[in-house]
Amino acid sequence: MQKEMMSVKFNEILYDSRFRVLSKGVNLHSVTVSGLYVGDLLSFVMAKAKPGQIWLTIQAHPNVIAVASLINLSAVIVVDGVDIPQETIDVANERGVVLISSV
């Protein structure tokens, strides 16, 4: 039996001080989350992630943003304190993708 996940407003989970929003100009109050996808292989993410999900990954290169935009993911969270290049942040800003780092 498959359980349906309830949607929450993204800003409700952002009050945790372990996370830092890096992208600018995105209205976090309007972002709705439908689930999570955890993985690091871009081809797997493209095949299995669903629109509205948050993607948890250690990948931090600009192609991550391209994949997130293609699938219409709610956000990308780069975990484990991995450094995110400025180029990736710039691409996230250009494409309107919510990019978050764990601290």
Predicted regions and their residues:
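Conserved catalytic and cofactor-binding micro-motifs
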Residues: 1-48
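Feature captures the catalytic cores and cofactor-binding loops of soluble hydro-lyases/lyases
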Residues: 30-33, 39-54, 58-103
